[in-house]
Amino acid sequence: IYYSMFGFQRIGDLAWMAGDMQARGFLLGGTAGRTTLAGEGLQHQDGHSFMVSGTIPNCVSYDPTFAYELAVIIQDGMRRMYKEQENVFYYIAVMNENYQQPAMPKGVEEGKVKGMYLLQGGGKRRKKVKLRGSGTILREVI
């Protein structure tokens, strides 16, 4: 776990080295997104780490909002790295906001690992709006 004040770029050389070495493990970058620690200045608002982490082929990146998402991601990472023996490492953004953690909806595990799942349906209205979000902004989206 590291304080990602300036984001993934701060540890970029180490991340590339981990990729080249085929390292396995988890990097948890604290203070994710552009919404946390806004009062401390823009340098504390990491909004670009996923652009940088996406350039490393064996770096798997996630921006979870809820604790159950983090549990699903870590469980899948352990399976991939240690059972399947894949040479991947994970970058996971975590945040420092305190809020109510919901129970995990049934059947979201596969969608979360793939990158998207339906958190709640919109009902049976004819016109629908599809909202997407992750990480620090998801609570405002819902």
Predicted regions and their residues:
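Glycine-/acidic-rich phosphate or pyrophosphate-binding loops and their flanking alpha/beta elements
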Residues: 47-50, 56-57, 70-142
